[in-house]
Amino acid sequence: MKDQFASYFEKPEFKRTLAHYEEMLSSGDTRYFEATELTEIAEYYAMNGDSQRAEAALDYALRLHPDNLDALIFKARARLINGHLNEAFNIAETITDQHDREVLFLKAELALANRQHSIADNILRAMIEGEGHEAETYADIIDLLVDNKQTDMANDWLEEALARHPRKQILMESAAYSYAQQERFDEAIEQYNQLLDMDAYSALYWEELGKIHFLREEYDKAIDAFEFAIAINGDSSYYSIYAAANSYFNIGNYERALEYYQRLHKVYPETVDPLFHMGMCCVNSGDDDQAMEYFTQALATVADGSEEQAQIYSQLSLIFSRKTQHEKAISYVDEALKIFPDNTELIIMKGHEMLCQGRYDESTEIFLDALTMNSQHVERSLFLIGVSMLENNYYEMSYHILRLLKENPAIEDELLYPYLCLCEWVLRESSFKSTLATSLSISPRKTYEIFNLPATQGESVDAMIERLNTINQSQSAV
């Protein structure tokens, strides 16, 4: 069964190989890698949209292993993906064994890309007949068609396969994969549940089921599935441990999420992701000092100039901002900007720190630069600037900016309305009650957080306003 979410690339052993390869590129040296290692690296780059690096890895593989079948097939597919169909055909023709099973699959794939569906079907028909209509062959064909987004053909082959081999486990796996890829999640879940009836101790089935629930944001169900996989495979269940941690994180159970991230870090101490997320759990739990320790440890594990390094610098900047150490915050955001100098969110962060210091003119200049740089997607920048103005008590300016974004699809109402509420409350706008009602209905947790109030389940708008008035009167009396 195919892993539709490419969890292999999250595993530390792959990350180590990738790091060794990238170190080789940086140093200009040459090192020996197995052809399989290089094709996996190429697949990783391709999955992340970096076709140039993918092909470079394949070229290096063919330099070391010029007749390697897997590398040649992958190279042909890479050319195909990049729109060079003729080159892909030419590479396929150079392969010595034209009757190799994987070469036939490649030829079918090339025919599909050339919209020669009947030729592709003939190749696949000859294969299924030559292999005696075996269930395993059907499964491979269905997976190929699904991967090439030939939904109708895949469904026809699946129907035929299940008619010949009803309740054959490998075909049920292909069916589940196909349904998941087509986002027919209810049917995919049903298939995985049937597979689990056959093999309740399959960590793979539990993991795949968890992934679907995670995609549907059904985090409680995802956690149940991932924890079954973990119970079966223990610490070797890297993906399931990571996904369970992420699921707990997404429902705000940072204590439980932290336990899973710590478990990952203990087993895979050289991997940065658990350390970074351990820091984020502490940030969200209000423990900035512990978060700083984790982020500092994480810095020691990342490559200079990497995206991960920039993310850590930005989090450290935010921590020092909350500690009102704004010069220190600026120093860390400057480090992040060395890596991504055109990142408008980082630029706005720097402007925010200057505004916190009362450097209004300088911050305004930086904000305007950010808006100019991000003119095609200005709404997100405006929102961040509006929030910065609000947090620095420039309520009228903040309200003017945020009000421009009402009913703008680029900014989700769940993000916008709590901040609008606070502006309207401070400015005593007549629309406050209506805005508060909307905010409580779509983003209750953030609304209470913005007003620094403990959440009260089922509280009416009038009751919350009464609480706010009581607090306001108490503060005025003091």
Describe the function of each predicted region.
Residues 97-99, 298-300, 403-410, 421-447:
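TPR/TPR-like (Sel1-like) alpha-helical repeat modules
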Residues 14, 51, 85, 117, ...:
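TPR-repeat structural position
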Residues 43, 77, 109, 143, ...:
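Residue-level recognition of tetratricopeptide repeat
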Residues 36, 70, 102, 136, ...:
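Start-of-helix register in tetratricopeptide repeats
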Residues 74, 106, 140, 174, ...:
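Canonical tetratricopeptide repeat
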Residues 47, 81, 113-114, 147, ...:
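Register position in tetratricopeptide repeats
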